[in-house]
Amino acid sequence: WILHDWDEDKXXXPYYNTI
């Protein structure tokens, strides 16, 4: 499924992680 998390590498931007 898709989880909503925060990507520190993008400097605090929301990204979607497929697991």
From Swiss-Prot:
On the 2D-gel the determined pI of this unknown protein is: 5.8, its MW is: 41.7 kDa. This is Unknown protein from spot 67 of 2D-PAGE of etiolated coleoptile. It comes from Zea mays.
